[in-house]
Amino acid sequence: MLGAMRRIGEDPLAFLAGQWRRHGDVVQFPIPSPPTYMVSHPDDVRTVLVGRSRDVTKDTLQYRALSRVTGQGLLTSDNPVWREHRRILQPAFHPDTLPRVAEHTDRAAARLVAQLSALDDGAVVDIDARVMTLALEVVGDSLFGHQLGPVADRLAEATLTALGEVVALARMPLRAPGWIPTPGNRRMRHALTELDAAVTAILAQRGAQGPSEPADMLDMLLASGLDRTAVRDEIVTFLVAGHETVASALTWALILLGKHPHIADRVAAEAAEVLPGPGDEPVIDLPTLARLRTTRAVVDEAMRLHPPAWLITRRTTADMEFQGAHVPAGSLVIISPWIVHRHPTVWTDPEEFRPERFLTGEGVGGAGVRTAYIPFGAGPRMCIGRDFAYAEAVLALASLCRAVRLSPSGPPVRALPLVTIRPDRPALMRVTHR
């Protein structure tokens, strides 16, 4: 048992993939309490997340660790809190809100393009840090009507610090209590102070300016009757998870395009044809976004190979059966989209970067295999911000590719499984102007 836990901590992706290759689609780990299983076949994934979603909860170490940062927000809570908060927040993610997301993304992308355009040809940037800031700015503007401005970089750093401590807690739960001033606890407290200061600033600005028009997510939270702690938890949840997922998808898309410049050129050509030009009225509506088909396919393929949420866990509240294996109530069930997205019964040449597979329907063609692609989860707990994230990622990627070519510089990055899949070092890329 100790050996298995050590290997999980050292390289979780390699360990889980090795167990899957060795034992198949249902793996029972030598962990007695709770009984722990990993399921990887899309049909079993569908059972857990869709068909029997009422028989599982998020009462797992993964989500308890994350709640140190987000509290009982939408990402970590269970019923009845989750159902009530989802009802309150759902209107903020109606398709009618996507043009506003596109508008804010267009502005944030234009700022980043201007920064890159001011550099000399051949300059090297950490593209991961740049898109982290972009994604935070879009969340702040779109959901809270708050321009984060110069604090966005600080918030991005605080988010990475807090999530790093979450991962450490999830992998080594027998740590010193939070009140003991260990280095890790001090880092966590400092990060939470930064995040809570952002919440205070967002609420103070809304108090001074009054409701947004049209209403945004912050208005809905403040009108809901939720107490200050619940409002704080949802703001932090969306500041953290709302930008981390998009930033991860964008970073890996740009890294992969840097290795496949001919595909980057196709994205740039599509963007030049579809997006408004520099002198045009910057109106980006849903039909415009829908025309960015190649760009969307690149985002999809980047999230297939590097799913932002690489690990999904659930606690069973009833007995289940997968591929003939009995899983008792009270078990921990692990799903790794990293593995599911490579399942050979669905994906051809699963390790290859082939965005065109999403233009032909491979892997997502029918109801029986929709759970073969789960970058945002599936079923009732599917990410509420899925369409928001797609609009932002697709538009930002198109805007960047139209303006610059980005090619790898320095040692290649590897996937580092933290709360999301991150590069294991700065994602250094060389800028060439188009």
State each model region's role.
Residues W20, A109-L112, L160-T161, A272-V274, ...:
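Cytochrome P450 proximal C-terminal region
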Residues M1, T57-Y63, V81-R83, T97-S248, ...:
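Cytochrome P450 heme-thiolate monooxygenase catalytic core
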Residues M1, A102-D106, E157-T161, P211-D219, ...:
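Cytochrome P450 I-helix active-site segment
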Residues M5-G24, E281-Q323:
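Conserved cytochrome P450 K-helix E-x-x-R motif and the immediately C-terminal K′/meander segment
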Residues T245-E270, D387-V404:
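Cytochrome P450 catalytic-core helices
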Residues I335-V364:
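Conserved cytochrome P450 K-helix/beta-meander segment immediately N-terminal to the heme-binding cysteine loop
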